[in-house]
Swiss-Prot record:
The active site is at D286 (proton acceptor). NCBIfam families: PRK04750.1, UbiB. It is found in: Cell inner membrane. Its EC number is 2.7.-.-. Belongs to the ABC1 family. UbiB subfamily. ATP binds at V125, A126, S127, A128, S129, I130, A131, Q132, V133, K151. The chain crosses the membrane at residues 496-516. Is probably a protein kinase regulator of UbiI activity which is involved in aerobic coenzyme Q (ubiquinone) biosynthesis. Residues 119-497 form the Protein kinase domain. The lineage of its organism: Bacteria, Pseudomonadati, Pseudomonadota, Betaproteobacteria, Burkholderiales. It comes from Acidovorax sp. (strain JS42). PANTHER family: CHAPERONE-ACTIVITY OF BC1 COMPLEX CABC1 -RELATED, PROTEIN ACTIVITY OF BC1 COMPLEX KINASE 7, CHLOROPLASTIC. The gene is ubiB. GO terms for molecular function: ATP binding; protein kinase activity. This is Probable protein kinase UbiB. InterPro entries: ABC1_dom, Kinase-like_dom_sf, UbiB, UbiB_bact, UbiB_kinase.
Length: 521
């Protein structure tokens, strides 16, 4: 289908499902709304607007379904009724021909499939818009037979994606320029985010790298299993990972009859998530029930099994500090501190008044404290803070929105397992430990130890730097302001070098002594 024909199809679907009322209600040009009223044949206006939007996206195909799924995570931009409905979108499409999957594998590895795998199951076990999964057996580097899951990219996706993305970018530009809410909704930014997300999913090596990173991070935590990646069998279009065997986590009755401790399972999920967030700053961001199983094998009984690593989130130290302090200030009911954190983040316009933001946050948060602590949703706390921030034109960072969406998934899953789950009691030790690590002497020691070689290298250069500085003093007394400022900056740099160099020298000696002592004993 040509781009023009596809564009006509999209416009027809928008009008058929009455989405013009949703899109054009904030447009500055009344004549646009009048034109759309002329086209009334076959319109479906009896359902709520969120349902109509979901059905329209489903009728436009898998790329628009995935776009709706991404939109559902942007609850800082979407009204709750629309975000809730979009969260129901399912990325399910019929599997493609196994012969096409085999041809993709043979093209990727330039070998017949019989030379790549010991055996290959032609029947796919899962299928989505981007890829489908087959089971197979390989020989690893030691010659052992290993059961694996093979993810194969759906062929011909890139041209389809690029065509739909071009149309989305064009429509986003129209909405941003014509709608009164265009700037707040940031449609072009959302489409650009979706563009990056889709192209990341089209590179299965990237997903393999995400899985390998999570597996390495989680090795010391005996609560979760991450499949091993077989790099010799990975390609941009083919991903081969260890086959994991478990029970889907939403089959609670089956897990309970197998003897799994369900309340502990709920707590373990929270522990895994907060470990990934506050310890590692790298978290699995697609933890819905379809991507989580529970092992019933005797040696790993009751452990989580994580699958599908196409979406991950990363947090900087600043992001983690923002989250930890927001949560602790909220539970202390210190709304002024919450407001100050928003302003200190630099995401709030400079003219924002702390007391006004504090009052708005108090209005949102105070009703939560009429409930038992175990009923308070940290994900909803973040969501309400984001929604309040929107009124003050706060620029919420995408990684925090992704975390908020994932946190809601974790809470929903945890309370599905155990309605009495107290999320705060489970999360609090992580927040306290992380803040202690950030503020305590251990962090200072880690930073000094990391910089010791650099400071020790600077120290021998200090006499020469001091000599050069003294020789460059002006010969006359006429010194303008710019030269004074430049001289002051040079002096500050010199003093900083002296201080850091001295610290580095002392620290270097300590580290060397410690190293020698360890070698001796």
């Amino acid at each position: 289908m040509s781009r023009f024909a596809r564009g006509i199809t999209i416009v027809w679907v928008v009008l058929r499902y009455g989405l013009d009322e949703l899109v054009l209600s904030t447009f500055r040009q009344p004549w646009l709304r009048a034109v759309t009223r002329v086209i009334t044949f076959g319109r479906k206006l009896d359902a709520p607007r969120g349902q109509r939007l979901r059905e329209a996206l489903e009728s436009l195909g898998p790329i628009f379904v995935k776009f709706g799924q991404v939109l559902s995570t942007r609850r800082d931009l979407m009204p709750p009724d629309i975000a809730d409905e979009l969260a129901l979108l399912q990325d399910r499409v019929p599997p493609f021909d196994p012969d096409v999957a085999i041809a993709t594998i043979e093209r990727a590895f330039r070998r017949p499939i019989g030379e790549v795998f010991v055996s290959f199951d032609r029947q796919p076990v899962a299928s989505a818009s981007i890829a489908q999964v087959h089971f197979a057996v390989i020989r690893d580097r030691q010659g052992h037979a290993r059961e694996v899951a093979v993810k194969v990219l759906r062929p011909g996706m890139l041209p389809v994606i690029d065509k739909d993305l071009a149309l989305m970018r064009m429509m986003a530009g129209w909405v941003e320029s014509l709608s009164a809410d265009g700037k707040r909704l940031k449609p072009r930014e959302v489409v650009a985010e979706f563009d990056n997300y889709l192209h990341d999913e089209l590179d299965l090596v990237r997903e393999a790298a995400n899985a390998a990173q999570l597996r390495r991070n989680m090795q010391g935590l005996d609560l979760v299993l991450i499949p091993e990646v077989f790099w010799d069998f990975c390609h941009a279009e083919v991903l081969v990972m260890e086959r994991m065997k478990g029970v889907p986590i939403n089959q609670v009755d089956r897990l309970r009859s197998a003897g799994v401790d369900i309340p502990k399972l709920a707590r373990d999920g929270v522990t895994i998530f907060f470990t990934q967030v506050f310890r590692d700053g790298f978290f699995h961001a697609d933890m819905h029930p379809g991507n989580i199983q529970v092992s019933l094998a005797p040696e790993t009984f009751g452990r989580y099994i994580s699958l599908d690593f196409g979406i991950v989130g990363t947090l900087t130290e600043f992001d983690k500090e923002y989250l930890a302090q927001n949560f602790t200030a909220f539970f202390r009911r210190d709304y002024k501190r919450v407001a100050e954190l928003h302003i200190e983040s630099g995401w709030v316009p400079a003219h924002t008044r702390v007391n006004e933001l504090e009052a708005a946050i108090r209005t949102v948060c105070e009703p939560y404290f009429d409930r038992p602590l175990k009923e308070i949703s940290l994900g909803m706390v973040l969501l309400r803070l984001f929604q309040t921030s929107r009124r003050f034109q706060v620029e919420i960072q995408p990684q925090l929105v992704l975390l908020q969406k994932t946190l809601l998934n974790i809470e929903g899953l945890g309370r599905q397992l155990d309605p009495d789950l107290d999320l705060w009691s489970t999360a609090k030790p992580f927040l306290e430990k992380w803040m202690l690590d950030q503020l305590g002497p251990q962090r200072l020691w880690r930073e000094l130890r990391a910089e010791a070689p650099h400071y020790a290298k600077i120290l021998p250069d200090l006499p020469r730097l001091l000599h050069d500085f003294l020789r460059q003093r002006p010969n006359d007394n006429r010194v303008d302001l710019q030269e004074l400022l430049a001289t002051q900056k040079r002096t500050n740099r010199l003093l900083q070098s002296l201080i850091y160099g001295g610290l580095g020298f002392v620290l270097g000696l300590l580290v060397m002594q410690l190293f020698v002592r360890v070698r001796i004993f």
